[in-house]
Amino acid sequence: MSQPRRRVSKIILSLSLTATMVAGLGYGVAGASNFDVADKPLDLGNPEVGMTIEQSQFIAHQLRPVPLKLKLKKGPRPAMLKWVASDLDDDPFMKDDAWRYVRKGYKQGQIIRKRESIWSKAYFPGSRAIQYAFVSYDSRGYPMTATATLVLPPHAKENANILQWNQFINSSGPKCKVTTQLNQPDSWGIVNSPIQIMSAALILGHPVLFTDAEGPRNSYAINRLASHVLLDSMRMVHKQKDFPLRQSHFVSMGISHGGLQTGYAAVEQPHYAPELTPYIEQFIVNEGAPDFIKLAHSLGLYGDLSKVPSPWAGFLVSFIVGAIREYGDMVPHMEHWLTPYGKTVVKTSRNLCMPFSTVAGGGGLLKYMVKDGFFKSTTFKTMMQIAKDSSSFYYPGAPKAPTLLIHGTTDEILFQADQDKALWQRYCKAGTNTVYQQVPLGTHFTTPVVSLPRMVVQTLLSLNGVRQIPSCKIPMIL
């Protein structure tokens, strides 16, 4: 057994033993006194196993509305809390120093530094890969360094249309970013093979843009931050001078976690990057989760599902880590609420890449991660506000660019086919060119496979300027 696998096996065994001890010693119900009690604690209602839209909205209406636009700031971001920071060294190329350049007058998408990616040639033979660090903004409007990799096929033409691939990461470790993957021979556990499906676009002469949508702090599933990275990477492509792409158009697509990023970018783009509207041919959102209030329930944070082990708890743990990294100054007492088991899970997850991050948190009972009283606390209410702010379902706008939503009706992780259907109806009423592709009996893992031909055809058409035909009367059945 290799050293990394041996190390991960020990971690998983440790978590299992810790969980057993926690259950036996009753840490999950340890009192936390009346410390941090919210003035108006959230009423979570009594959500069903397949939480309805109305039950999610009941919780959402107790929280602040999601702002349509953010006020962009110039100063540095609030410091990240040390206990959620990875203890692995990050690539210096990712240094979060954008605020210094903003004070010099740099705008969104303006390049801070760049480098050639040598190892990308192993994945995409014959192509040139350039990695850029550029100015973007986080989910609260603070300047942030974003990174992306632009792969140029040898036969690319001037102003060729570009495929933006938004990779599913599901991780918290600094070695998980696509830019890092493509710049080293061993990315410590991340699955590299999915990014190679982009080779088809390269063969046809279309550049491919890989985004690092978790930002420099590896903040998993903070979707407004991810949206800014995606949109500012398009701006960056128009500004770079390594190859003439100033008038290039984009097709932006993602699956699962990549779908979360893409879906939020689609809905926020008219207000964050309105000048890009003529340049975006298509957003493709496959198996995204637009409603994080429901997702927290589906993954076992609260309600009846919190009483059974969740095989997907690792996703929720990664989100908790990402939320604390992004909003640490707003949830300063989160560490206080964690049990010893919870602290062990967080400490482990902050370094891991998929699939290890999923395995390490899987099968756990999330109620054992926090002390009794947590769900009445200001900290929990703030975390649910963060979840709402990361939900494209609760964003008050609609896309301007054509948007394709794809979801399986029996998705066993997200349970959000109804949410996508509701978004489709909402976007149609707003005048968006929208299609909802429904996959009967499709699961989270089979839906992308079954819908792959549809995605490929629409991608190729859109890259050649042929936009999708809107369908607002009935869902398309695949």
Question: Can you describe what each PLM-predicted range is?
Answer:
Residues 32-157:
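Catalytic-loop region of hydrolases
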Residues 41-97, 286-396:
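Accessory cap/linker subdomain of secreted extracellular hydrolases
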Residues 147-150, 159-171, 180:
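Short beta-strand element of the alpha/beta-hydrolase
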Residues 193, 220-242:
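Alpha/beta-hydrolase active-site loop
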Residues 235-306:
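Primarily recognizes the serine-hydrolase "nucleophile elbow" in alpha/beta-hydrolase
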Residues 384-387, 406, 421-478:
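C-terminal catalytic histidine-bearing segment of alpha/beta-hydrolase fold enzymes
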Residues 399, 404-411:
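Short beta-strand/loop motif that positions the catalytic acidic residue
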Residues 412-419:
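Conserved alpha/beta-hydrolase "acid-adjacent" motif
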